């Protein structure tokens, strides 16, 4: 298992280290996630990581003299996560780079490409579905559907106004306690969209549960009872007319609740990071994160640069992550 910080230590090139830090700065998820880096590409160019997910735990019993235990077995099921290649390329004219001075165009484009890669990884961690997109792995929304850690799947909690927050914040706290009790450990984050994070801060302030810590770069991070909030932010979508709209990575949707359409519903995710719960996957060696800078010493007016990350996620136990469904925020 390796973290991005540990992966950075093994890189001797300063630019490589800087690009890795850009990923860590832009994504607290990537910064704190541990990755199994033992995956070796198979034949045929596959990057499949197979693992077992525990679905039914073992039970212990007491028995009377001259009686037998009732047989019961823990059960697990094989799953596969295909490591995906995230990244992108950009092109820069050598004149633009030469005249950009201290505000390097290469540095600017690299930083923006890292941010876009982090956004896509966040989106895939939540919304990924390998059945509908072969370039994706299965995200938490799909993995937790129908599991014991999918909480409030058929109910609804109203936080759509300040008055509703005043009335219902204790109910939300009870549901959070219920969710946390289903996990195999303490979650690393409370993952939600921006609007839901703001609602959670309101609840934490009302309850006296607002806490504050620092990330790896000394930046302040708010949390709920010591669990940091992780804003999964937005993902830009290109429309038919060429314009871009940004939509929350954890969506705000209209859903059917008790045979009635309810708008403004969203979810909160609680991942427990660890070898036997929820972790990342990458390949063995130095290909985890790579950058390829434009080489303006070569012929050609326009040179290309690229940023690339090889990653997937694995949920080793159904209690390694949880989702609290159907919170109305609009």
Model regions and ranges:
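Flexible, glycine/threonine- and acidic-rich loop/arm segments that mediate assembly and lattice contacts
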Residues: 1-246, 254-330
